[in-house]
């Protein structure tokens, strides 16, 4: 009987991030695409500025990588979020499942693991679908900073 009750609890509520399988870990990603937007770092302060400039591999409409399995071949600077380096990614969005679970919080109601699709996430405008621009169309990345510092006004 106890095994039956345990199996009714979603893995993200019954396991720590460290105890999850690779498949479970990957499924936590909601596919919002926010990790796939380029960031700029201030050389003097190390402050990170977010842009709406999408990586060349990001399909903006679907918010999915065109070459996920081989992404590091195409984009050597692509991030790889792991259990070990998760604490170093302080810039992860407040809506990120990895961040939320690491902070002891639950998944948001729109998360694809709860809803079965990305539709609610897109509807809540969590994904970059509505803001991202193609890297090839950008001339000055500073014009695309979302969290502009005072000096950029």
Swiss-Prot record:
HAMAP family for the chain: UPF0260
Pfam families xrefs: CxxCxxCC (PF03692)
Family: Belongs to the UPF0260 family.
Disulphide-bonded residues: none
InterPro entries per UniProt: Puta_zinc/iron-chelating_dom, UCP006173
PANTHER family xref list: UPF0260 PROTEIN YCGN
Top-level taxonomy: Bacteria, Pseudomonadati, Pseudomonadota, Gammaproteobacteria, Enterobacterales
Organism superkingdom: Bacteria
Protein name per its UniProtKB record: UPF0260 protein CKO_01185
